[in-house]
Amino acid sequence: PLETKLGRKRKVNQSTCNKDFSCVDGFCPSFVTVQGAKIKKRKVTPASDLPMNIFNKLPNPKEINIEKPFDIVVTGIGGTGVVTIGALIGMASHIENKGVSVLDQVGVAQKGGAVLSHIRIASSPKDIHSVKVGKTSADLILGCDMVVVASSPVRELMNINTTQSIINDHETPVAGFVLDPDHSFGGKRIRQIIEKSSKETNFIN
């Protein structure tokens, strides 16, 4: 769905297209086949041309002492990098000689299904007794998808007194739009649900 001055229209997100070309059989809302055309590529600067000294100006992050495990939950939908984020944070913690565990819950998600990554960081591996973040124990929610964050399995991990939430407020179309062109995403209601479940919430796009 694309909201315009002339009402709601439809557009195709080519970045999430499957490459099996089933769209040409009529399963894509575009219903258009362009022959002989090429996608215009963006002009990018080669890495070799970048001024590497800009990274030298960045201060080193301050190491902190963790008295108890710090619990992070990364949430999103399949195909958007939730598992990758968990792996990056896990490796960064390992490089700092911290104890870390990463548990990915992908279920049957491939594209569009809910995905969670439970990340626990401690001063030492012996301080981590469970790899799953417990109920009301999340210190930080990194929400790549609002709908997933507002779901019951995620909200029960949040604590109104301690949880900090950083949420991507992009409204990814849900299944309801397939059957009902006028389906309401309910973004305002979803925001309120998340805010009521967190101590502090920051929405970014």
PLM regions with names:
Residues 2-50:
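Terminal amphipathic helices with adjacent charged low-complexity linkers/tails
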Residues 1-5, 70-73:
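C-terminal accessory/binding modules appended to enzymatic or scaffolding proteins
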